[in-house]
Amino acid sequence: IIMEHSKVPEHIYNKGITLHTVPIYRGLPVTQDPKLNSHSKLNCILACIHAQKAGADEALMLDPQGFVNTTNSCNFFIVRRGEVWTSTGDYCMNGITRQKVIDLCRAHQIPIHIRNFSLMETYGAEEAFLTGTFGAQTPVDSIDGRTIGTPGQWPMIEKIRKLYKNLVREDTA
């Protein structure tokens, strides 16, 4: 099965998406390596259904220790005090776009931290975004009904999106 190529509608980049924290993990290494992209993603499908029933666009998933991890389909980042944070990657697929964003931050002196962080730290973020092959860097408007930062104002996300677009343009020229 090959997924259809889809592009995030432009209005999503202006409005952002909503996330709902779910009680479903991405996967445990003893049952299914969460770092691998596999055909068996029942847990991610169930997480997405749970989030959509709660009125959200996607599910925010925690790791087995309760730290923020990933969404049901994309990697997750937050911005706090001018620093970009993402999970350790121990319980999520370490995507290509995720790594490109990490590399761009390092190359352009944007502080980037790959670390464990709590849901409460996430609620206090100035910005949050997802990374994925089709979504690039998609802003998050709210998590669990809590607005993240100032709606529609995402200076760090815009900076990273511009750097990412330039990288793609250079690589495909």
Regions found by a protein language model. Give the residues of each.
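Helix-start/capping segments and mature chain N-termini
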Residues: 1-173
